[in-house]
Amino acid sequence: MKQHPAPPYRAGQVLGLVALIAFAGPALANKALAEKQGCLACHAAATKLVGPAYRDVAAKYTGDANASAILVQSIRNGGAGKWGEMAMPPQKQVSEADAKKIARWILDGAK
């Protein structure tokens, strides 16, 4: 039986799928991490709950070179006065490494 080479567009489809998995994987993992750490009990991507919406947080820190460090500190140490009267309690159970992943996810649009 004669075998025919795969059509050239197949390579593009495969590369596209690999790229999708490569970029979506970390985002999904970081959303799951935020959920596991309890962040989504008070925050949502696009809606203010107890705390600000993540899109509003990302917008506030757009262009700020220290944004990630500020968010990591807020996650781990809590904070007050940035988003109204409700204070964010410290989340000491969140490791520095996990706080960095969550901060990056928030700044990237929390998708």
Regions found by a protein language model. Name each.
Residues L28-A45:
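Sequence/structural segment immediately N-terminal to covalent heme-attachment motifs in c-type
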Residues A41, V50-Y61, R76-A103:
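Axial heme c-ligation environment in periplasmic c-type cytochrome domains
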Residues Q3-G16:
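Bacterial N-terminal signal peptides that target proteins for export
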Residues D64-Q73:
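Post-signal/leader-peptide non-cytosolic segments of secretory proteins
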